[in-house]
Design a protein with these regions (language model features):
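Short polar catalytic/cofactor-binding loops
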Residues: 10-15
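Acyl-thioester C-C bond-transforming condensing/cleaving domain
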Residues: 2-3, 17-46, 60-153
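Short glycine-rich phosphate-binding loop at a beta-alpha junction
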Residues: 48-55, 111
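Conserved PLP-binding active-site segment in aminotransferase class I/II-type PLP enzymes
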Residues: 1-9
C-alpha cells in the first residue's frame, strides 16, 4: 500500500557564475549550507530524520559519497545517507527516491537534494601529460623543470 508524501520545506543556495562568489566552497559546503537552512526553516529536528538522499553530478574524488559528508555535518551520524547521480536531474532524482522511501513505508521523514560546484570539478589528463608534470615537479633545478615542461605537446 502506498502512503501519501508531502514536501514540507525547501532551501537552496543561489545560482552564481563559476569561480566567483562561491569559489571557495565545495559541493559539500554548499550542501551543508542548504540542509542546515532547510532544517532551520522546517523546524524538523535532526533526530526526526530517517534518511538523507543527496546527490551531485560531478563527484569529488576526495569525497565521492556527498550524501554521507553532508549528512555527517548536518544530521545525527545514525541517519543513513545515499548518494545519487543523474545528469542534470540529480536533485529531482533525490526527491523522487525520498518520496519512494516514504510511500513504501521505509521512512517517515527524508531530506533530499543535490549540490554542485563547477569551480571544483576534477580535471583528468592523459597519462603522458601527467608523467611530464610529475617529472617537472621533481626536477631539482629551474632549467631541468623548464626542459621537462618544454617536452609537453
Amino acid at each position: 500500500m502506498s502512503r501519501r508524501t508531502a514536501i514540507i520545506a525547501g532551501s537552496r543556495t543561489p545560482f552564481v557564475r563559476s569561480g566567483t562568489v562561491f569559489k571557495d566552497l565545495t559541493a559539500i559546503d554548499l550542501g551543508v549550507l542548504a540542509v542546515r537552512e532547510l532544517m532551520d526553516r522546517s523546524g524538523v529536528r535532526g533526530e526526526d530524520v530517517d534518511h538523507l538522499v543527496y546527490g551531485t553530478v560531478v563527484h569529488d574524488p576526495h569525497a565521492p559519497n556527498i550524501a554521507r559528508e553532508v549528512g555527517l555535518a548536518t544530521l545525527p551520524k545514525t541517519v543513513p545517507a545515499v548518494t545519487v547521480s543523474r545528469a542534470c536531474a540529480t536533485a529531482n532524482q533525490s526527491i523522487a527516491d525520498a518520496a519512494n522511501l516514504i510511500e513504501r513505508g521505509y521512512a517517515d521523514v527524508v531530506v533530499a537534494g543535490g549540490s554542485e560546484s563547477l569551480t571544483h570539478i576534477p580535471i583528468t589528463i592523459k597519462q603522458a601529460l601527467a608523467e611530464k608534470l610529475i617529472g617537472a615537479s621533481k626536477a631539482k633545478t629551474l632549467g631541468a623543470r623548464l626542459g621537462t615542461l618544454a617536452k609537453i605537446r
